[in-house]
């Protein structure tokens, strides 16, 4: 006979996602009446009596003591099932005890005395959910047929016989779910189970808890969940059968080590001293277990050991066959280890824990430049911002206040802006509690919180909880976009609706006239007119503290403004409210004319190593932005060529190389390594293999990088190397075998070449860095032609090499500013006077100068030299004492076609002496002979070294034909053109034969000879105004000097060997 009640038949119901069948779980909201088959003890007794005989025949009767509730449990470690008791399967024992057995799980038997039920009936109607104390009054007895006693406080094993009972009084904690043990093979079990009210469980129920779907069991058959579990277990079974690895096939999928596998791995030695993060490798191979040939990056909560408990097993974060691939990630994870160790592993479900760890690893790999707080926001770790976590970080890590203002380099914003952009609503609320002033700050591009907000929810809570931020609702960013403009342009309709509802406008009002002109193309004339009419507005600032220099978008307008910076009292390195100079701001904001803007700023004297409040230079910002294609590599090359320090570190101890290595940008890394960027110091955390201290030596690394950089076809260029006789001359000089009573003088010669004079300057800068001192004071006699004379005069008048570099960048825009030659001669003369003054040549006391020019008044043309000393009487007449220096320079730079002749007769000295090295040596020889003939041989000087500087070697070109054919006029024209180019090339030659002659003459005198002339990747015309061409030429020269450091070092040895240099007094005697 079967008895049913209103709760339906007795069934076992379990939760989806749990593949292992547990046997008993009591819900927090379960009524005690739900565990009985009827509403009265009489019903219970009757039902039991009617089924007693059939139960007895099956041999399943267990003798119980009256007044106790008994449960027979076969596997107490598994507890997903929620039993609903029915009288359908109630059975009566010999002692009058009712026992209930499940349809689907015959191992589960619930037995209770009807007398006990009658005694407890009134109290049993109370809900456990309302008061757990009700259930604590009931004494329960568990018959442990399977030798295990289950208690929610603890699980203990007790060996008993079938007649032995263990009695325990239920406590409040007895009525919770018992956590299911995870299956090691499949790894698919949920770590925790929610509490379920039995009354909400029916055969047709679709929900049992807010987050889980309950699937009814099919009577006398497999449930859907059993089928799912079998499907999930099947691949693991096949893998084990086929001896496939236990971990996932994807190398970046986080997997927890099965306990049985821990014994087969050993820890690999690394430079990271943190037991939580280790690299392990397989160590043994057996018939049953093949050795794992992959390295595993492991997160071990309590260390990597086979003795750990199931809940503390390590996680394999990443796998690779090459240990080096894991080292970078190891250092990154170690730097952010707090994010892993702070996870609440004791209460978190296993699948959720794995998911959170995997999300951390993904973010760290994708965003290696992120600091800890940025990763916490990206992974939505609200617990990171809790009071306990903050206290721990303040005591053991970087202060939390410092982290809140830690700049995110690629996004160029702060954590609060990142949280708004990613719409981390809970984190935003927490930040409002911690420090509302964060929401009044702008990022480096001038965006405030209203620009970043991505949901109306965040917008509303900011509006309500931070009233101060309401004042910025119409503030524009660096691009002139208001928050409402931004919301509309980025398709955020709900945010746009919110802003409009709060009174936001599309525009805040125009800036002053100068600001408008600075953002307009080809508006240089407008800038000049505005400054002439209202010079006072040149120093005005906008709401973000930006000056007119900061907002410039085009080179022409910026040049027009900075040309009057001295007159207007402008500071080119002035900082805005964010603490950034115009240079730093240009790097981080996408300017349409970035490279020309950078060149213009440097030409006018901008500090290339200026820092923001975080200590970041332009190179730091570039290293973070190159990967995002926000800045070109040409800009980076220019910054380095212009003096940006590749080894400067910011306030966090990060160098540009560290940031580039974090992003694994190989091109950027190659540039920095070629520039001499060093690795991070030993012990610095978060380094990847390209910046860690434990790798190859610096010199080997530099050489390897430089060897890979090729400029043109090497066979086209003369090599910078010593001949055997030159090595001997240098050795004799350093050994002192050429000692004598004569004063030794160092000679320097500079070729002509227009704008390519930048090659000479870049080379001199490299030598000066190795010398560690002002190089020009080590030379006693100098000669220069055309652009070489400008450099020589600038250094002689006290300019530094960097100032001369800036002068040349100004020259190309001010002097070569026409569409085509001839260029404005008046502008050239004015520029020379502005840069070198109006003093005379004779006012420069030292060193001796020779400035070449060609007098073209009659044929044959004559080479004339402007000097600041009296030459030998048979060489040339004395230069007039009143000759201005600018006039001598004007004569020497009067390149035919490009400029009108000076005084209608003087043209560029390069026509005859484009490489004045031979003329310089001739001048010294004539001086000594004059003294010898006048009986003052002891006053003669001895040449100590000759250094010749060229303006770069251009790539070779093929001459098609040199034959003139009267039957082919076109060919004849080509021939004439080729002959003209050849004649001009040889007339102005500074490479080839002139260098060979100088080298041989110096060798005959046993004088060390050095020749510097960088190979250029393209032919740069001497009047080129292209910023890209100029920057390429500067970089080619920079790389040339880096490749020939040994050659430069030999020159430095020779210059420093003579203790008389620099001379305290002149070694020369008047003739």
Curated annotation (Swiss-Prot):
Residue window of motif GXSXG: 784-788
Q: Name one GO biological process term.
A: response to starvation
Disulfide pattern: none
A molecular function annotated in GO for this UniProt entry is: actin filament binding
Write out the catalysed reaction.
Answer: a 1,2-diacyl-sn-glycero-3-phosphocholine + H2O = a 1-acyl-sn-glycero-3-phosphocholine + a fatty acid + H(+)
**What range(s) does the PNPLA domain occupy?**
748-921
Region (Disordered), start-end ranges:
1-22
Which residue ranges contain the repeat ANK?
A: 411-440, 479-508, 510-539, 544-570, 578-610, 614-651, 652-681
Cited InterPro entries: Acyl_Trfase/lysoPLipase, Ankyrin_rpt, Ankyrin_rpt-contain_sf, PLPL9, PNPLA_dom
Motif GXGXXG per record, residues: 752-757
So where's the catalytic machinery, residue-wise?
786 (nucleophile), 908 (proton acceptor)
Q: What does this protein do?
A: Phospholipase that plays a critical role during oogenesis, ovulation, and/or embryogenesis.
Concerning its family, UniProt says: Belongs to the patatin family.
Q: What is this protein called?
A: Intracellular phospholipase A2
